[in-house]
Design a protein with these regions (language model features):
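N-terminal helix-loop segment corresponding to the beta1-alpha1 unit
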Residues: 1-182
Length: 182
């Protein structure tokens, strides 16, 4: 038995939230990764085991100890399945675009009536109501918006900062998501 044994987490596949799911799974929570029909996009991220593109070490690293289910959220039947899955969960992890969950009838207002005890963790780059909420985002833009790159690189700040490696912006957000759940 581990610290989070007995907790069920539903994670909507996204590289922005996957590390939070990994941390919860590694602590013993049952994490169910919801993937689109073509699979989590990170399944195609390098590096690959023996250069085989169907064996992504990146995907394996971020999804250890997770279960997986494929749902086509463009269909009503799979949207119902998602709502039923979330209704049985303790925690929902997602980083969906602002209006996506409302379109699926899976926003907090709907989900909280299905499961009043649900902990809904929405890892969004600029929140849900900020004027920048709909802007595209990458790990690099998150880091730049937060300021850490200016402390990376050289003492001479007339030189450009050095980009950190390894999805540091996503990891920082996921650490805070993980701590918020605990």
């Amino acid at each position: 038995m581990t610290a989070l044994t007995g907790l069920r987490v539903v994670e909507l596949a996204s590289e922005r939230i996957s590390f939070a799911g990994k941390l919860l799974a590694d602590m013993g929570a049952e994490v169910i990764l919801v993937e689109p029909p073509h699979g989590d996009p990170s399944r195609s991220y390098p590096p690959f085991l023996e250069d085989n593109p169907s064996q992504s070490l990146y995907f394996w690293h971020y999804n250890t100890n997770k279960k997986s289910v494929v749902l086509d959220l463009d269909t009503n039947a799979d949207c119902r399945r998602l709502r039923n899955l979330i209704a049985s969960a303790d925690i929902l992890l997602e980083s969906e675009p602002i209006h996506r969950l409302a379109e699926l009838r899976c926003d907090y207002d709907v989900l909280s009536t299905l499961n009043p005890q649900l902990i809904h963790v929405a890892l969004t780059p600029y929140g849900r109501t900020n004027p920048m909420s709909d802007l595209p985002v990458t790990d690099l833009t998150l880091m730049a918006a937060g300021g850490p790159p200016w402390s990376c690189g050289y003492d001479d700040h007339s030189l450009p900062p050095v980009r950190g490696w390894g999805n540091q912006g996503y990891h920082t957000g996921c650490h805070f998501a993980y701590m918020s759940v605990l």
